Amino acid sequence: MGPELQGAGGKCSAELSALEACKQRAAERIQEEAESLCELSRDIWSRPELAYQEQQAHETLTRFFSSRAGWLLEPHYKLDTAFRAEWSTPLTDNLSQPLHVGFLCEYDALPSLGHACGHNLIAEVGAAAALGLQGALQCSQPPRPVKITVLGTPAEEDGGGKIDLIEAGAFVDMHVVFMAHPAQEDAAYLPDVAEHDVTVKYYGKASHAAAYPWEGVNALDAAILAYNNLSVLRQQMKPTWRAHGIIKNGGVKPNIIPSYSELEFYLRAPSLKELTKLQEKADACFKAAAAATGCRVELSSSGHDYYNVLQNKTLAKTYVENGKKLGMQFAADNLALNSLSGSTDFGNVSFVVPGIHPYFYIGSDALNHTEEYTEAAGSKEAQFYALRTAKALAMTALDVLFNPDLLANVCEDFKLIKLIEEGNMHVTEKSRESSGGAGCASR
């Protein structure tokens, strides 16, 4: 559909409320930028880059915002391939602190597959939603001044760029944050789970495998036992737990007892508490393999742990209401909540500021992390769905900005789900300090 909301007749008529007129203008602004947004997405898609190496995607996005009036750009924000673009409404007085809304862009790709997770579309949606919100606020004055920030967040697939930015203070004064991820359906929430990566290294002793194998200590045997130990463990794992890995190094030649082997595993569970339990069980499997073979084992993690995404029901409900106005058909709540998803460093963001991480259909039933999804993410058909999602995000942001009670409910949801997640029904100073989100701080 075009910039209009369904049923709006294509014009901001007198019957529309001020808020609905703002939403109409947001959708129109996004549609006006459709060609340039498509070019941005296509440019990123056609030149895939791995985590922390997204030089060309970074250049494309920073050039995009530097060419638009009113945006203040920090091209290398905290990380080489991160950026920050800001736009603000005029301050009405010196006492009014602006409501700070964030939109996140991802743009790293997968090894050998390119943009098989559609991060080019995530970048496009984040940029589009920010422009839509800007366009709406240029036509109407919200109750309080507003600051819009677009954060370019590298390295979601490997490393956790958002976690680096959290630690650098990038989210400290934000009230609410938005991003959306491509998938096979529209869903306001899917249970993205907590994830821990572990690298397992076994050190043995080389020897001639035919002449005197008894002199060797076989590190490959340790790796195979470890892999099989994890496979056996799955019988006793909860249905919502996941452990998957590869053997990265298993020796150099058949007639040499391998003195070194290496595995890499990802462990996932619905919550940080459950992830800790799974990690303990997995570590026991790795250590048992070392004991059985006489190898020395070394366990390490190459990056940050990803937290599970905390659901903000108020934001999700508001997003669904706006999405339905645009023709979205959302997955049933029971199906979405009982489905299994992956992991994202947005989960860590959801622990420090209220936010939403919906999923959106792109016109294909292909599965993420496949060659077919790479093709779908770069298709012309995906553009309609990406821009529709951006409109829904911008409209949801407008609801938050123009309805103080809604923002209060968003904050209450955030506080409650954090307390439930932490298993602590008493707000401590530590949890206040770590909340990060300006809108929900105790002050």
Curated annotation (Swiss-Prot):
Pfam families: M20_dimer, Peptidase_M20
Protein name in the entry: Peptidase M20 domain-containing protein 2
Origin organism lineage: Eukaryota, Metazoa, Chordata, Craniata, Vertebrata
Protein origin, superkingdom: Eukaryota
Any GO MF annotation of the entry: dipeptidase activity
Family membership noted in the UniProt record: Belongs to the peptidase M20A family.
InterPro entries named among the record's database cross-references: Bact_exopeptidase_dim_dom, Peptidase_M20, Peptidase_M20/M20A_hydrolases, Peptidase_M20_dimer, Xaa-Arg_dipeptidase
Signal peptide: none
Annotated source species: Xenopus tropicalis (Western clawed frog)
